[in-house]
UniProtKB/Swiss-Prot annotation:
Xref: InterPro entries: AAA+_ATPase, ABC_transporter-like_ATP-bd, ABC_transporter-like_CS, ABC_transpr_CbiO/EcfA_su, ECF_ABC_transporter_ATP-bd, EcfA2, P-loop_NTPase
Job of this protein: ATP-binding (A) component of a common energy-coupling factor (ECF) ABC-transporter complex. Unlike classic ABC transporters this ECF transporter provides the energy necessary to transport a number of different substrates.
Protein family: Belongs to the ABC transporter superfamily. Energy-coupling factor EcfA family.
Pfam family, one: ABC_tran
Gene name tied to this protein: ecfA2
Annotated compartments: Cell membrane
Organism for this UniProt entry: Lactiplantibacillus plantarum (strain ATCC BAA-793 / NCIMB 8826 / WCFS1) (Lactobacillus plantarum)
Membrane topology: Peripheral membrane protein
Subunit structure, interactors included: Forms a stable energy-coupling factor (ECF) transporter complex composed of 2 membrane-embedded substrate-binding proteins (S component), 2 ATP-binding proteins (A component) and 2 transmembrane proteins (T component).
Top-level taxon of the source organism: Bacteria
Name of the molecule in the record: Energy-coupling factor transporter ATP-binding protein EcfA2
Keyword Transport: yes
Domain ABC transporter: 3-246
Alphabetized SMART domains for the sequence: AAA
Binding residues for ATP: G40, H41, T42, G43, S44, G45, K46, S47
Length: 295
């Protein structure tokens, strides 16, 4: 499912002394099946744009087309329930939204709210729990007895239980340790392919953008200031610095190496790309000497 913004402006509390313009002339398409990263410094408009992705907010002017549905400033809220089933949002710290007595009931709540029978919803709950890598023995447990990482996966299972076509991830690894963050991001990558999802990732983690995204949207002061592939976005450190953004760690290290004489035809985004570029520049017998030294 594609999402297209056309000449979208959004203003909070229009016509009041507290009027604040948050989005200006947004024109962009998130393609079906893509993995799009949305980046920008705090206050750039990311969260406001995110809430337009399933019409939690409606544009003050312009249109947002979600699949075949066109959202305008006058679209009635009562017509949006089914649409929101198709665009699932995993908000920051989603485990804080858990509330039911058992894991099964919490995951099943969404499907039942959209008309599924209790039996079908509980069956879906078991399937979604397995999908996020948790054992079915947890179904009868209270979600509040689980570890923080397990609680987050249960909350994500609840979003997936709605069978969304678009999965929006708002800082999904916030508060996790490095291994937990890696496991979570690998899970989303797997789900994207297994469920044929369109994924939108809102993050401050440039490494995750480099490793997982196909497309990047950069926001600043309520406007889209650049779009492109991760390689296109991260090729200009000075531009990123001017917009209060950083580089992936691997790319930053490559820039340091360049100052010491190393050459790169294109900036590496991943550790594997960096390693390959370094090996190409080593003397012909260097790797053999390293192997002999290790022995």
């Amino acid at each position: 499912m594609a999402i297209t913004f056309k000449q979208v402006d959004f203003t909070y509390q229009p016509g009041t002394p507290f009027e604040t313009k948050a989005l200006t002339d947004i024109n962009v398409t998130i393609p079906t099946g893509s993995y799009t990263a949305l980046i920008g410094h705090t206050g750039s408009g990311k969260s406001t744009l995110l809430q337009h992705l399933n019409a939690l907010l409606k544009p003050t002017s312009g249109t947002v087309t979600i699949g075949e549905r066109v959202i305008t400033p006058t679209t009635s809220n009562k017509d949006l329930k089914r649409l929101r089933q198709h665009v699932g949002i995993v908000f920051q710290f989603p485990e804080s939204q858990l509330f039911e007595e058992t894991v099964a009931k919490d995951i099943a709540f969404g499907p039942q709210n959209f008309g599924a029978s209790e039996a079908d919803a509980l069956k879906t709950a078991a399937e979604m729990l397995a999908l996020v890598g948790l054992d079915e023995s947890l179904l009868t447990r209270s979600p509040f007895d689980l570890s923080g990482g397990q609680m987050r996966r249960v909350a994500i299972a609840g979003v997936l239980a709605m069978q969304p076509q678009v999965l929006v991830l708002d800082e999904p690894t916030a508060g996790l340790d490095p291994q937990g963050r890696l496991d979570m991001m690998e899970m989303f990558a797997r789900l994207r392919h297994e469920r044929d999802l369109t994924v939108v990732l809102v993050t401050h983690q440039m490494d995750d953008v480099a490793n997982y995204a196909d497309n990047v949207i950069v926001m600043d002061r309520g406007q889209i200031v650049k779009t492109g592939t991760p390689r296109e976005i991260f090729k200009d450190p000075a531009w990123l610095t001017a917009h209060q953004l950083g580089l992936p760690k691997t790319t930053a290290f490559a820039h340091t190496l360049q100052k010491q004489g190393w050459q790169f035809n294109e900036w590496p985004l991943t550790e594997d790309e960096l390693a390959a570029a370094i090996v190409q520049q080593l003397p012909p017998n260097a790797m053999g000497e390293v192997a002999a030294h290790d022995e």
